[in-house]
Amino acid sequence: MSDLHNESIFITGGGSGLGLALVERFIEEGAQVATLELSAAKVASLRQRFGEHILAVEGNVTCYADYQRAVNQILTRSGKLDCFIGNAGIWDHNASLVNTPAETLETGFHELFNVNVLGYLLGAKACAPALIASEGSMIFTLSNAAWYPGGGGPLYTASKHAATGLIRQLAYELAPKVRVNGVGPCGMASDLRGPQALGQSETSIMQSLTPEKIAAILPLQFFPQPADFTGPYVMLASRRNNRALSGVMINADAGLAIRGIRHVAAGLDL
């Protein structure tokens, strides 16, 4: 039996991409899974697909009242909350400083930071009392843009660097009761969209990047699927497998940090 059996896990943005892969994985691990999802259609799809195994709540991660409503339903259903996974986010499709109009830059900043940073902060606030009571954990989705330039434009990159600071501060404030960590995946097959302020709300990441382009820059030379990144979340959520890690950011970058100067990877001819 998995050590996550009957653990209560709350994931934001569980309707598609990495969020959906996390929902699938934690249900497989025997956890009681809940998600806060903006799209009514995705909420309906989750309920139809997973039935009683999912508590799918329609709501916006930029609204504290929606978080409170979700947490109340989780506590009514499970009687506890063991792990909060802040995952919902948006990308800026590499919108650059020079090519983005000033007024768009300002409105895009507020929209993107509201989702990627404030959304995490509000989720942490709403979940903290229950997680302190259960001595549970928080996990936040980062990105390779939390370590490197070029994983997005200045808006997205700044938001993910801000999230690393949030993780460290919350890990400090909530210790010893709550472990707070992050996972930073690289590019993957997902439906990640952009800010409406930048005209990107209907544009997914795969319309800007191709599988071949993503695989070519990674030393491990493959095109990741969302399920490829769920393992670190499972490990960090596990009380047995993660007793000692807090304030840690796992850089799940398929080897980006070891790219060579002469070649992407030295073993391409092996």
Curated annotation (Swiss-Prot):
Any one biological process term the GO annotation gives: 3-phenylpropionate catabolic process
Catalytic activity: 3-(cis-5,6-dihydroxycyclohexa-1,3-dien-1-yl)propanoate + NAD(+) = 3-(2,3-dihydroxyphenyl)propanoate + NADH + H(+); (2E)-3-(cis-5,6-dihydroxycyclohexa-1,3-dien-1-yl)prop-2-enoate + NAD(+) = (2E)-3-(2,3-dihydroxyphenyl)prop-2-enoate + NADH + H(+)
Sites where the protein binds substrate: 143
Keywords for this protein: Aromatic hydrocarbons catabolism, NAD, Oxidoreductase
PROSITE patterns: ADH_SHORT (PS00061)
Active site positions: 156 (proton acceptor)
InterPro entries for this protein: BphB-like_SDR (IPR047950), Dihydrodiol_DH_HcaB (IPR023643), NAD(P)-bd_dom_sf (IPR036291), Sc_DH/Rdtase_CS (IPR020904), SDR_fam (IPR002347)
Binding residue positions for NAD(+): 10-34
EC number(s) given by UniProt: 1.3.1.87
One GO molecular-function entry: 2,3-dihydroxy-2,3-dihydro-phenylpropionate dehydrogenase activity
CDD domains, A to Z: BphB-like_SDR_c
UniProt keyword NAD, yes or no: yes
Keyword S-adenosyl-L-methionine included in the entry's annotation: no
Pathway assigned in UniProt: Aromatic compound metabolism; 3-phenylpropanoate degradation
UniProt xrefs under SUPFAM superfamilies: NAD(P)-binding Rossmann-fold domains
PANTHER family assigned: 3-PHENYLPROPIONATE-DIHYDRODIOL_CINNAMIC ACID-DIHYDRODIOL DEHYDROGENASE, DEHYDROGENASE/REDUCTASE (SDR FAMILY) MEMBER 4
HAMAP family: HcaB
Function: Converts 3-phenylpropionate-dihydrodiol (PP-dihydrodiol) and cinnamic acid-dihydrodiol (CI-dihydrodiol) into 3-(2,3-dihydroxylphenyl)propanoic acid (DHPP) and 2,3-dihydroxicinnamic acid (DHCI), respectively.
UniProt similarity note: Belongs to the short-chain dehydrogenases/reductases (SDR) family.
NCBIfam families for the chain: 3PPDhyd_Dh_HcaB (NF042950), PRK06200.1 (NF004849)
Name of this protein: 3-phenylpropionate-dihydrodiol/cinnamic acid-dihydrodiol dehydrogenase
Gene: hcaB
